[in-house]
Amino acid sequence: MPGAAAKGSELSERIEGFVETLKRGGGQRSSEDMARETLGLLRRLITDHHWNNAGDLMDLIRREGRRMTAAQPSETTVGNMVRRVLKIIREEYGRLHGRSDESDQQESLHKLLTSGGLSEDFSFHFAPLKANIIEAINELLVELEGTMENIAAQALEHIHSNEVIMTIGYSRTVEAFLKEAARKRKFHVIVAECAPFCQGHEMAVNLSKEGIETTVMTDAAIFAVMSRVNKVIIGTKTILANGSLRAVAGTHTLALAAKHHSTPLIVCAPMFKLSPQFPSEEDSFHKFVAPEEVLPFTEGDILEKVSVHCPVFDYVPPDLITLFISNIGGNAPSYIYRLMSELYHPDDHVL
């Protein structure tokens, strides 16, 4: 059919364009935009492609998911959305197959040992499966749109009047969180500039426009100022499987200073940033950029004698984190494993 062929070629072009964008680093898109675009493409794949059963569909989603994640391994949000869709397919197939949700969750060590690695049969055909999966993906897209508002709505539970709050760099989620609290509370925000990119300046300008008392400081002053701080509130790029963070460079220094002064460290991050990856997976963890901000090309004599690496992210271990605030509430780092089992199936951790 010519119409189907045209649809297929248009979808292939869109996926190819998305993969190219990922290879170039994702441009200026936020993690939320990446998550939404990934879900949109996967939804189109499900509706436009011909597949007979859940097994065929999962193979298709995995194949395209591997392409997307390989283009930019450090953009973990893309892989997370692929895993969420695979989990949705499993759940909807299970409902039509007459299996309860509870039987899918491996809740205890005994169940893990006795499950024996049996693989489920996804070869049965169910006519309503496609419509059910699309409906579930649409619900997930609606959930994505409300994540920032849901996190910001919890601000008054954590920020009190006349407190001194410290943050680092720029995070849209933290900005919304602080602005929501500022509607009813007066407090002072200290922003570490996050050199060499200095995204903290943008954060400080946005907060001051809302009438929030804001101070920008250099990263070197974090430890000296920490004794005056009541809470540290930060964003993150990824929450890893062990409850640790992959956050902007400089966050580890901030977390260590907070731990030394017994200052609570709160991480504001939506659930789509929760990844089943571990910090030992180097390809997806590390990302380096050009070091011209650290050592400009005008320093020609020095450039010949040194090799400069400019990492984008820091690893922050879970023992430095007090609380995670997500769109579904607040949780300790030790609870991350449970959230992981609710969001992703163990067989989908590696695509």
Swiss-Prot record:
Coiled-coil residue windows: none
Principal place of residence: cytoplasm
Any one GO MF annotation of this record: GTP binding
Protein name as catalogued: Translation initiation factor eIF2B subunit beta
Summary of activators and inhibitors of this protein: Activated by the chemical integrated stress response (ISR) inhibitor ISRIB which stimulates guanine nucleotide exchange factor activity for both phosphorylated and unphosphorylated eIF2.
Gene: Eif2b2
Example GO BP: central nervous system development
Species name: Mus musculus (Mouse)
Cellular-component GO terms for this entry: cytoplasm; cytosol; eukaryotic translation initiation factor 2B complex
